[in-house]
């Protein structure tokens, strides 16, 4: 009463509790004999808990018992067996999965931990793993996602019944050979294949690994520059025919640098970068050659060369600004002329100035022919300081007039008080 299960991680031998669980043992043995579990996936693995399989769909919602061949649709699930009591006390216990209504189908799990007592009253134990505990250790070490689905594609490759104490039933059909894998199993999978290398650095030297890491860092930096807007495309590369020259003497000019580097080939552009305001040299320059070969020769020959009492440094340019540099009209390609359709009327060149309507045409006015008389032009606008000065002067004049008026009124009042008529009135 034993079954050999061959998995992609190793073999397992399961002994069945035929006397204690006869219906469960019959269901498991006949399903193994009819190759029902072949190519089934371990769709759920929880570390130190359980590894679940037995669902041909790989979703955890499918599967049916062998009694469906005997009794039809009503035998898809069968009632679980409770007695005698058995407990999940160690690694390697095999139990059928309860579908929620105390009914069992084809799905089963193998415990990967010890003392899992909370599984005793829910699921039905029908066997235990006697050989292949190292395979269970491998299952327990597998990494899984948040839904407990392993990243690796682990399957049951074959099942062999070593001992079957039950009689054969004519209603159960057994295939002559093991089923072949489907196209979805081989290609349409998002899991890691077993023959796929997990360690990408296996068989590589330290130099190759360091070079790959450097390339990854460069790609990450390029993507960051693209996101912040410094690069238009992360895969953009600088031109191969441009040299970067630094540590120049401030007195070195563009013409001198072009003459020195022109012996390696034709130079399209030689420019020393200067300060925008002062025009002083920033002591570095860009030299654009006609081809990449000349640029490479200059790189090997001119590095650390003495120019104007300065040891210059030469390197390939890493700037992509040359790709978007404005080209003068002499270097721009003219757009092809539009082809004239034979059915359309020939185009007539028109001036940008709109011709006046015949009704609006008038004879030229004699006033317009007169020369401009600058003597009648209005005076230029006064400055703001002049305006403020005039305003202050007018303010002082107004105050002076006001004081004079008050002084005159006081003088008249005193004269009136001194008059004889005013004195007579007081008496």
Curated annotation (Swiss-Prot):
Keywords: Chromosome, Coiled coil, Isomerase, Nucleus, RNA-binding, Rotamase, Transcription, Transcription regulation. One of its GO terms (cellular component) is nucleoplasm. Residues 384-427 have a biased composition (Basic and acidic residues). Residues 6-161 form the PPIase cyclophilin-type domain. Residues 322-334 have a biased composition (Polar residues). Residues 351-370 have a biased composition (Basic residues). The keyword Cytoplasm does not apply. It is found in: Nucleus, Nucleoplasm; Chromosome. Disruption phenotype: Lethal during the early stages of larval development. RNAi-mediated knockdown results in 95% embryonic lethality with 86.15% of embryos exhibiting gastrulation defects with decreased expression of genes involved in gastrulation, and an increased abundance of unspliced RNAs, decreased levels of phosphorylated ama-1 at the 3' end of genes and decreased histone H3 modifications, which mark transcription elongation, in embryos. PROSITE patterns: CSA_PPIASE_2, RRM. Residues 322-427 are annotated as: Disordered. It is an enzyme of class 5 (isomerase). Residues 195-227 form a coiled coil. Its EC number is 5.2.1.8. The keyword Transcription regulation applies. Ubiquitous. InterPro entries: CRIP, Cyclophilin-like_dom_sf, Cyclophilin-type_PPIase_dom, Cyclophilin_PPIL4, Nucleotide-bd_a/b_plait_sf, RBD_domain_sf, RRM_dom. One of its GO terms (biological process) is transcription elongation-coupled chromatin remodeling. It catalyses: [protein]-peptidylproline (omega=180) = [protein]-peptidylproline (omega=0). Belongs to the cyclophilin-type PPIase family. PPIL4 subfamily. This is Peptidyl-prolyl cis-trans isomerase sig-7. It comes from Caenorhabditis elegans. The gene is sig-7.
């Amino acid at each position: 009463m034993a079954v050999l299960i061959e998995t992609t991680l190793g073999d397992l031998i399961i002994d069945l509790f035929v006397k204690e669980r006869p219906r469960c043992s019959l269901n498991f043995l006949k399903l193994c004999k009819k190759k029902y579990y072949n190519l089934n996936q371990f769709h759920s693995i929880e570390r130190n808990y359980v590894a679940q399989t037995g669902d041909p769909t790989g979703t955890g919602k499918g599967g049916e018992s062998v009694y469906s061949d005997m009794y039809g649709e009503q035998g898809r699930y069968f009632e679980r067996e409770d007695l005698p009591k058995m407990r999940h006390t160690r690694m390697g216990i095999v139990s059928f999965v309860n579908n929620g209504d105390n009914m069992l189908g084809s799905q089963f799990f193998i415990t990967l931990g010890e003392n899992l007592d909370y599984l005793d009253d829910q699921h039905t134990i029908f066997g235990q793993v006697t050989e292949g505990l190292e395979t269970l250790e491998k299952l327990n070490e597998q990494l899984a996602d948040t839904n407990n689905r392993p990243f690796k594609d682990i399957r049951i490759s074959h099942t062999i019944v070593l001992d079957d104490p039950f009689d054969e039933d004519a209603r159960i059909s057994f295939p002559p050979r093991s089923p072949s894998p489907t196209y979805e199993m081989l290609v349409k999978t998002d899991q890691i294949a077993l023959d796929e290398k997990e360690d990408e650095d296996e068989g590589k030297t330290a130099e190759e690994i360091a070079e790959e890491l450097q390339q990854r860092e460069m790609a990450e930096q390029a993507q960051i520059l693209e996101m912040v807007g410094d690069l238009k495309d992360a895969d953009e590369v600088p031109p191969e025919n441009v040299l970067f020259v630094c540590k120049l003497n401030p007195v070195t000019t563009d013409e001198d640098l072009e003459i020195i580097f022109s012996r390696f080939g034709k130079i399209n552009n030689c420019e020393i970068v200067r300060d925008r305001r002062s025009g002083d040299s920033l002591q570095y320059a860009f030299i654009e050659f006609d081809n990449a070969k000349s640029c490479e020769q200059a790189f090997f020959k001119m590095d650390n060369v003495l120019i104007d009492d300065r040891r210059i440094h030469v390197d390939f340019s890493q700037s992509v600004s040359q790709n978007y540099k404005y080209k003068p009209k002499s270097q721009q390609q003219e757009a092809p002329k539009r082809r004239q359709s034979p059915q359309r009327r020939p185009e007539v060149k028109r001036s940008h100035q709109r011709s006046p309507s015949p009704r609006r045409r008038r004879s030229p006015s004699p006033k317009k022919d007169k020369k401009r008389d600058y003597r009648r032009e209005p005076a230029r606008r006064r400055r703001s300081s002049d305006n403020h000065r005039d305003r202050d002067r007018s303010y002082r004049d107004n105050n002076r007039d006001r004081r004079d008026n008050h002084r005159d009124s006081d003088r008249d009042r005193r004269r009136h008080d001194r008059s004889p008529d005013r004195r007579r009135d007081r008496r």
